[in-house]
């Protein structure tokens, strides 16, 4: 795994990483919450590599990162409440579970829904823009292990070709997950508190 430090001008590193993703290989990249293991979300072989690398059950869908609401609406259906939350908190530590469209079955474990987010991290957003489509965003660890907040905590055995190093990301607080495939339901409380979510969609 080649580690590329994201210094002041990291455009070249992002271009290299986007090229790796377009080839169907894996990249470790920073988000606003943790280091993620990424693959091209539209490439089933890349999704399978992520499952195998993390030792993750194929019955557990993989979340995706998009660069903006326009890209989100290309791959998922946003109802009024979901749009309200997205407008208020994204980019940010919020993951929305939405009915999917135009995504491979393997990525979503044959389910009709997908977990999608827009991370508040400029490097992550630019990486997704350079790829031109959604990027898998799952913690860069083995399933069941603590999520990494530094590159030193990322197992080399994950098989990522490149790791983008932005230093220590700080506290291990995950994104808040809200399911909009039925009545809005908080699946996991993270950085954004449940009462904030409920007041926004109530």
Predicted regions: what they are:
Residues 1-202:
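Active-site-adjacent structural elements in enzyme catalytic cores
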């Amino acid at each position: 795994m080649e580690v590329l430090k994201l210094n002041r001008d990291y455009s070249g590193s992002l271009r290299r990483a986007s090229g790796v993703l377009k080839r169907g290989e894996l990249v470790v990249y920073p988000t606003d919450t943790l280091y993620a293991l990424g693959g091209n979300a539209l490439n089933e072989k890349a999704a399978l590599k992520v499952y195998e690398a993390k030792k993750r059950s194929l019955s557990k869908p993989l979340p995706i990162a998009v660069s903006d609401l326009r890209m989100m609406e290309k791959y998922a259906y946003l109802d009024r409440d979901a749009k309200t939350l997205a407008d208020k908190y994204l980019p940010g530590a919020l993951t929305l579970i939405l009915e999917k469209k135009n995504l491979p079955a393997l990525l979503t474990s044959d389910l009709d829904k997908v977990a999608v987010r827009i991370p508040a991290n400029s490097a992550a957003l630019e990486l997704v823009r350079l790829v031109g489509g959604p990027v898998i965003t799952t913690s860069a660890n083995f399933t069941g292990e603590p999520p990494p907040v530094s590159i030193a905590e990322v197992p080399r055995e994950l098989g990522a070709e490149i790791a983008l190093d932005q230093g220590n990301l700080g506290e291990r607080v995950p994104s808040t997950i809200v399911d909009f495939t039925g009545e809005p339901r908080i699946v996991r409380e993270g950085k954004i508190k449940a009462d904030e979510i409920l007041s926004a969609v109530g």
